[in-house]
Amino acid sequence: IGVPSAHAVLDARRAASELSGARLGDRTVVWGHSQGGGAALWTGALADDYAPDLPLSGVVALAPASDPLALIDALTEVTGGSIFASFAVAAYTSIYDDVTFREYVRPGVEPIVRTLSRRCLSEPGVVVSILTSLGLSTDPEIFASDPTAGPLGTRLEQNAAPATVSAPLLIGQGGDDTLVRPDAQRAFVEGLCASGQRLEYAVYEGRGHIPLVERGSPAIADVFAWTAARFAGEPVDDGCRSLPQR
């Protein structure tokens, strides 16, 4: 959820400066993947107003959930989609009074949804192991009504990533991502370019949503190199000029 996530990131950076013994520089680059990538985009958009004392040197968003509506719509086609759906339902029902379990979650499934929402996708194969641990051989059908309609649909749309970020931006996308789809991400990037955003965009062919950030992914080395360049104050390439044609 955009605004509170951005505020939490910036508050955490402020708090880190107060840690005794911490040797932090005066430059900050925000990283995030998936929903964290969406939070990184929101952080970049709100930083100037919310935390003018913390100028950002860059924002890195890997497979960001830039379009929550499209993300929710894709969940039925993804292994472990029920887990990602549970993350969304738990978050939105906790923040918005008009989004309720009763309206959107099938009767009898609520305990499973609440359990799934507390699990962390921390390593390869964890999606299947989580479902197995709950005695589920397949993804449970969670939604009682269309999650892209009504109050939840409205709230999802409100949390689409902003059209501009106040810092240099790197977006990385897995070419084989079935959750955050490459075509949807490309459309988002084109919108950013049209709004005048300065960015670099990299597609990693053969990488899915989680493999994009697993050990051995070329995206990891690229993120470190890009971040080091921002810390060094190097100019940013204008990736909008070099976007491959559709």
Residue ranges and their predicted role:
Residues 148, 153-154, 186-246:
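C-terminal catalytic histidine-bearing segment of alpha/beta-hydrolase fold enzymes
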Residues 62-162:
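Accessory cap/linker subdomain of secreted extracellular hydrolases
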Residues 175-180, 210:
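Acidic catalytic loop of the alpha/beta-hydrolase fold
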Residues 14-84:
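Primarily recognizes the serine-hydrolase "nucleophile elbow" in alpha/beta-hydrolase
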